Amino acid sequence: MTANLEMDAEQIRRDIVTMIHHAGSGHSGGSLSAVEILTCLYGAVMRHDPGNPEDSCRDRFILSKGHAAPALYAVLSHYGYFPKEELMTLRCLGSRLQGHPCRDCLPGIELSTGSLGLGISAGLGMALASGISGDSYRVFVLCGDGELNEGQNWEAFMAMNKWKPHNLTVIVDYNRVQLDGTAQEIMPMGSLRDKIQSFGLKLSAATAMMWTS
């Protein structure tokens, strides 16, 4: 499984670079930094079925850092949600693959994103909704470290501590880079670990190299 994931990730990286180059625009850094995370989720962790993307028991994934859409598109294509050839329509007029994910355009997209800071709140709502509907699913949210400049994220962390959803996982892509500078230059946060733990949330850290050890 590990070897397969590594090969999947390598191909997905190639697809991201190719599609962004073909489009002539796109967020390459934020997309490439998310490859290992997305490959692990879709290739080994999440319960999902490309043949039945609306299955009520499917695990949900929210790309809160919506500018990394090329990474999500490449992963969805790789795992069978739509033909790989469609990747070359990224950002084209009338394409289903726009600059940010659109819920109504493409199978496998759970939430239209792009305006930063909304994904954790939406994921919390989805996770709590499973207790109401009786459906058994997990929710995974991927946000960027620069995205945590948005105050709504911290309100969502506070709400997570109150409601304590057992089926919600928030992943921070801690790449230390934002659109026009480093995260440290733009808005120093100090210890992200200490801040998150201060909300009473369980936290663990991983690096891309861990899956090869």
Which residues fall in each region the model found?
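Thiamine diphosphate
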Residues: E6, H21, C92-D104, A122, ...
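Cofactor-binding active-site loop characterized by glycine-rich and histidine/acidic residues
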Residues: I16-M19, S31-K162
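N-terminal hydrophobic or amphipathic helices/low-complexity stretches enriched
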Residues: M1-I12, I16
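Globin-like tetrapyrrole-binding proteins
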Residues: H27
